[in-house]
Amino acid sequence: MCGDRNFKAAAKYELHEMGHLSSHQRGLLMTFVGVLFLTPDALLLRLVDADHWTLMFWRSLIAGCCLFALNGISQKTNPIKAVAELFRNGLFCSLFFAGSNACFVFSITHTVAANTLVILAVMPFIAAVLTLLFMATKLALRTWITIVVAMAGIVVVFWGRFGQGDIGGNIVGDVVAVFCALFMAATLVAIARNPKINTLVAVGVGALLAALFALAMGADPRAPSGEDFIYLAINGGIVIPVAMALITHGPKFISAAEVSLIMLLETVLGPLWVWLVLAEQPGQQTFM
């Protein structure tokens, strides 16, 4: 009994301390937890035996529906009214996320997973530039230093790839990964610029737009097997909704560049899961 009382007292103390976190600390914590949820994303996509359009369709459709369900549970708002409000206040956020979603799936299926995730390290730089252009917000020197280090990783990934006959192969996936970073950075800046955006609805609409785009491009919804649907359900039903709900809430408390820097954790852990499960070893430049 004494041990049970001590446990309850400790739990209450932890909740009390959490309540005293500053808004900046809450933003950092939410983003960090969200990125941890996101790290298996690349692995779950690689485990599905389907073309990229079909992957994009199911991943986006399931995620979009779950994000709307989360919004209904947490916000208790009418989904039709929420979408109507989005058209006045956040449509660009949805379009940017749709582009990021589509580019990520295309890239992860057209190049080594580690390359896609490492190239996404350009996201903090893009977010910083967009923040300066559209929000006139100055970033701390340490943030810029971290961004420069991340950019150096991009140079290492691309180093030696050109001129070696790889132009028509993996390089396409690498280039699309850069556009993925651009769209995701724009999504975060759009939220930071207008914190009143209902991010669950905005990202949910973006996911559904990506699903419609994939269907128009030739997705075959019947292609995945039963086992494939398990991975798709985990990815679209748990990983993406939880991760995006937390990550897209981050820019309401911290800068978009800071959110992008925390997302570099996926660059470290994402390729590790793919390597451990599928033995897909990153290239020498990427591994460095």
Model-flagged regions — what are they?
Residues 5-57, 61, 65, 95, ...:
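Glycine-/small-residue-enriched transmembrane alpha-helix faces in small-molecule transporters
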Residues 20-21, 60, 71, 264-288:
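C-terminal-most transmembrane helix of multi-pass membrane proteins
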Residues 27, 50-99, 126-127, 182-187, ...:
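Transmembrane alpha-helices of multi-pass small-molecule transport proteins
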Residues 37-38, 74-115, 120, 156, ...:
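Specific transmembrane alpha-helical segments of multi-pass solute transporters/efflux pumps
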Residues 54, 61-65, 105-138, 257-275:
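Specific alpha-helical transmembrane segments that line the substrate/conduction pathway
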Residues 59, 84, 117-120, 136-156, ...:
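Loop-to-transmembrane alpha-helix entry segments
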Residues 67, 71, 97, 142-161, ...:
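Hydrophobic transmembrane alpha-helices of multi-pass small-molecule transport proteins
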Residues 116-122, 190-209, 240-276:
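Helix-helix packing/entry segments at the starts of transmembrane helices
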